[in-house]
């Protein structure tokens, strides 16, 4: 068996198996994310939420997915059908392939490349095309306005996210996620992680992630009171399901990025406890809980407030932080908190 996996076909089988394992993890997580999102929202509103299908309503997401799949796919008469059908697939596939460089433990990653951050940033930047394609191909004013809003919103907050990540790269000396986690490994456990020296950026990254993934209170591209459902107005059945799945997968990806960049990835918060993927998944679940709580509690922003926050507050502050981190890392200020080089030095 070992000889087989050293051959060309064996390596191909191994790669396919690894891809399917990551795909399976993300898809199973998706079921629990939707269920958890609905349960948290219901609890805040003093409702019960899903509670009929399966134990504690756990199979409600499966039932809803089956309902979408068996429904008829309705394409508007004036729509550009090829682009209309391609848009949700683009959104879903791009959200999935970003997971190729996300490690869950030391060595547990599909592609352990040195430019992993650039890869994720490039793929996430392309996700806006799925939304624009869906809005334009629908041949309707509400989807088109929603897609324009989404494009402006995602581009605005990608700039801030990029600058925040640059601060972490300057501290680490690497764009590899495993190296970034290794740089946070210290004798003080939880207090050795990057959340402490980069504390202001943790809050900025979290808020920018909400805007980047079109989550409340920044869900302006699909604001029901203004645009009915934004770029999703004309979609039904499986295409709508793909859009929603892509959105939740992108949210979970942001939870993974926060965990890897600032909260030690798979490292244990207590030094004498073993590290492992359970810590990684647990931290991601915690940040998704925060995403869901913000959705349930915070009212929606106006569009002008959203743009003003991104360009006049987040952008200058994150740019100033990059300069500060570069200066602190170069001269090893604050006890070398900003100069824990994983490579080079």
Curated annotation (Swiss-Prot):
Catalysed conversion reaction: a quinone + NADH + 5 H(+)(in) = a quinol + NAD(+) + 4 H(+)(out)
Location relative to the cell: Cell inner membrane
Positions of transmembrane segments: 13-33, 84-104, 115-135, 161-181, 190-210, 248-268, 278-298, 309-329
Cysteine pairings via disulfide bonds: none
Stored InterPro entries: NADH_UbQ_OxRdtase_su1/FPO, NADH_UbQ_OxRdtase_su1_CS
Location (main, coarse): membrane
Cellular component, GO, one term: plasma membrane
Root EC class: translocase
Domain of life: Bacteria
Membrane topology: Multi-pass membrane protein
Any one GO molecular function term: oxidoreductase activity, acting on NAD(P)H, quinone or similar compound as acceptor
Record keywords, A-Z: Cell inner membrane, Cell membrane, Membrane, NAD, Quinone, Translocase, Transmembrane, Transmembrane helix, Ubiquinone
Entry EC no(s): 7.1.1.-
One of the protein's GO biological processes: aerobic respiration
Quaternary structure note: NDH-1 is composed of 14 different subunits. Subunits NuoA, H, J, K, L, M, N constitute the membrane sector of the complex.
Function as written in the Swiss-Prot or TrEMBL entry: NDH-1 shuttles electrons from NADH, via FMN and iron-sulfur (Fe-S) centers, to quinones in the respiratory chain. The immediate electron acceptor for the enzyme in this species is believed to be ubiquinone. Couples the redox reaction to proton translocation (for every two electrons transferred, four hydrogen ions are translocated across the cytoplasmic membrane), and thus conserves the redox energy in a proton gradient. This subunit may bind ubiquinone.
Family: Belongs to the complex I subunit 1 family.
Listed name of the protein: NADH-quinone oxidoreductase subunit H
Name of the encoding gene: nuoH
């Amino acid at each position: 068996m070992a000889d087989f996996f050293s051959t060309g076909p064996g390596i191909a089988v191994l790669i396919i198996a690894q891809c399917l394992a990551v795909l399976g993890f993300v898809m199973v997580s998706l079921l629990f994310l939707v269920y958890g999102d609905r349960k948290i929202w219901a609890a805040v509103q003093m409702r019960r939420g899903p509670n009929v299908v399966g134990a504690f309503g756990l199979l409600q997401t499966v039932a809803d997915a089956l309902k979408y799949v068996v429904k008829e796919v309705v394409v508007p008469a004036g729509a550009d059908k090829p682009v209309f059908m391609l848009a949700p697939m683009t959104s879903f596939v791009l959200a999935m392939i970003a997971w190729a460089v996300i490690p869950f433990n030391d060595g547990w990653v599909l592609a352990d490349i040195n430019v992993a951050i650039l890869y994720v940033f490039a793929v996430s930047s392309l996700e806006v095309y799925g939304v624009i394609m869906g809005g334009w191909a629908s041949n309707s004013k509400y989807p088109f306005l929603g897609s324009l809003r989404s494009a402006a919103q995602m581009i605005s907050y990608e700039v801030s996210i990029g600058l925040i990540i640059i601060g972490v790269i300057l501290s680490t000396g690497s764009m590899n996620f495993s190296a970034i986690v290794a740089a946070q490994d210290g004798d003080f456990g939880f207090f050795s992680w990057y959340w402490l020296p980069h504390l202001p950026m943790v809050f900025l990254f979290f808020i920018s992630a909400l805007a980047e993934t079109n989550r409340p209170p920044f869900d302006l591209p699909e604001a029901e009171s203004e645009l009915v459902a934004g770029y999703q107005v004309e979609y039904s059945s499986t295409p709508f399901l793909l859009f929603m799945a892509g959105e939740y997968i992108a949210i979970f990806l942001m939870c993974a990025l926060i965990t890897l960049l600032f909260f030690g990835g798979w490292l244990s918060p207590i030094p004498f406890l073993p590290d492992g993927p359970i810590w990684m998944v647990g931290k991601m679940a915690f940040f998704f809980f925060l995403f869901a709580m913000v959705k349930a509690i915070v009212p929606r922003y106006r569009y002008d407030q959203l743009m003003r926050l991104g360009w006049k507050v987040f952008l200058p502050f994150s740019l100033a932080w990059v300069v500060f981190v570069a200066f602190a890392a170069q001269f090893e200020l604050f006890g070398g908190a900003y100069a824990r080089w994983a490579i080079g030095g």
